[in-house]
Amino acid sequence: MILHLIYGPTCSGKTDMAIQIAQETGWPVVALDRVQCCPQIATGSGRPLESELQSTRRIYLDSRPLTEGILDAESAHRRLIFEVDWRKSEDGLILEGGSISLLNCMAKSPFWRSGFQWHVKRLRLGDSDAFLTRAKQRVAEMFAIREDRPSLLEELAELWNYPAARPILEDIDGYRCAIRFARKHDLAISQLPNIDAGRHVELIEAIANEYLEHALSQERDFPQWPEDGAGQPVCPVTLTRIR
């Protein structure tokens, strides 16, 4: 079985690359993302729209209400192994995402030692200014009012009505920044979807900078697979941590 692994920091184009390969191969994409397992925060977690998937298949490791909490890394890894094992009759799978904890669980597991042919592509952070430009564009898209999906701020305003969801939201990039922004400006969370243009721009910039901090931590803490063209078998269990 061929496993095509695509990993890298947020806003690096992983999903677009996975969709392209899925179109070319017909293989499903398994999302290596624990936050995307909560459909109630589809926009803020970066889940692609059905139209963006362009008829390709995308598999999430769970589907749960946010109040149940974010799926822990060990559970996500067990579900990933189940998905891969269950689909071994297929020619290949695409594994795409940027969960530091899940990728490191994979690095430590003997499951990935044998029985697979690996193709690995790691996307890099690159220049910080270029990253911030991409991140601002992405956040602006998340703030856009659409008929087919609530905006990030609408998701936050709705979920804030559930006290059990609040500490979880305060621990997720984007939502955490918006909550702090509301407190700084003495705004109710319910007011965030209707802030004026100036504050809109300010919040977009703040979230983009939070994404940059997260991307830097991903670059630092990701395991390291030999990539295609390395001239040696690709085996995740031999990974070394980037210090």
Swiss-Prot record:
UniProt function note: Transfers dimethylallyl groups to AMP as part of the biosynthesis of cytokinin phytohormones.
Alphabetized Gene3D superfamilies for the sequence: Crystal structure of tRNA isopentenylpyrophosphate transferase (bh2366) domain, P-loop containing nucleotide triphosphate hydrolases
Cited InterPro entries: P-loop_NTPase, Tzs
This protein's record includes keyword Transferase: yes
Entry keyword annotation includes DNA-binding: no
Source organism: Agrobacterium tumefaciens (strain T37)
Known EC number: 2.5.1.27
Keywords from the UniProt entry: Crown gall tumor, Cytokinin biosynthesis, Plasmid, Transferase
Pfam families in the record: IPT
One biological process term in Gene Ontology: cytokinin biosynthetic process
UniProt GO MF annotations: AMP dimethylallyltransferase activity
Protein name: Adenylate dimethylallyltransferase
Coiled coil: none
Superkingdom of the organism of origin: Bacteria
Catalytic activity: dimethylallyl diphosphate + AMP = N(6)-(dimethylallyl)adenosine 5'-phosphate + diphosphate
